[in-house]
């Protein structure tokens, strides 16, 4: 599959958890992933209200500064009872309350905001954007959603972010209790990447020369 696809790209993220997951997901395809931090590229601003807009901005930023095709991820957890919060602010949710930008602080703030609410349904959402160059007029966009519930008590030592509090009722486990292999088969990020690869393969086939049009 890798022979009809981009073989080297810059990943527009400095998040260690995301870097691990993308490395594991893309390695079998023979795609070399270069973290933007290795190229001295700072993180892009994320001023937009939607995952799609932020992912596009991050991908163009990384491609412009690296000269490489770029893959960007914008993702977060959305709680029904909070009208979709933390949403695009998931990584910096606690900062809204004047607290540190850490996973522990973000989780504590989410639990405090859900206190007294019966509806604990939530979903992780991921948008992936691939640009072949900074001015790519037709970025490839894919999305994935992973549904679950927010639980007060953390469980598990794996994953990152809100995973210890993200319960998967069908499995009876939190995302943090899954092995890396289990998570990478069913997560929002895995689903989005599967869709992205299918779109990339279709674009290459339609163009007929092994490269997307």
Residue ranges of each PLM-predicted region?
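Anionic-ligand binding patches
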Residues: 2-10, 16-34, 38-213
């Amino acid at each position: 599959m890798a022979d009809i696809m981009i073989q080297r790209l810059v990943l527009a993220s400095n998040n260690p958890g995301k870097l691990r997951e993308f490395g594991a997901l893309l390695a079998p395809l023979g795609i070399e992933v270069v973290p933007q931090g290795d190229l001295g590229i700072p993180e892009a601003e994320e001023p937009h209200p939607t995952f799609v807009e932020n992912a596009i901005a991050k991908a163009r930023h990384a491609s412009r500064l690296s000269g490489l095709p770029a893959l960007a991820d914008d993702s977060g957890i959305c709680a029904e009872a909070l009208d979709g919060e933390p949403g695009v602010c998931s990584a910096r949710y606690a900062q809204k309350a004047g607290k540190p930008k850490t996973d522990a602080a973000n989780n504590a703030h989410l639990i405090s905001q859900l206190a007294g609410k019966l509806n604990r349904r939530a979903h992780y959402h991921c948008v992936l954007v691939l640009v072949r160059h900074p001015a790519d007029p037709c970025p490839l966009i894919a999305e994935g959603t992973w549904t679950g519930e927010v639980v007060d008590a953390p469980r598990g030592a794996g994953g990152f972010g809100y995973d210890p509090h993200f319960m998967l009722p069908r499995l009876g486990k939190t995302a943090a209790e899954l092995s890396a292999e289990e998570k990478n088969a069913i997560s929002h990020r895995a689903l989005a990447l599967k869709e992205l690869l299918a779109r990339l393969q279709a674009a290459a086939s339609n163009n007929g020369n092994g490269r997307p049009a």
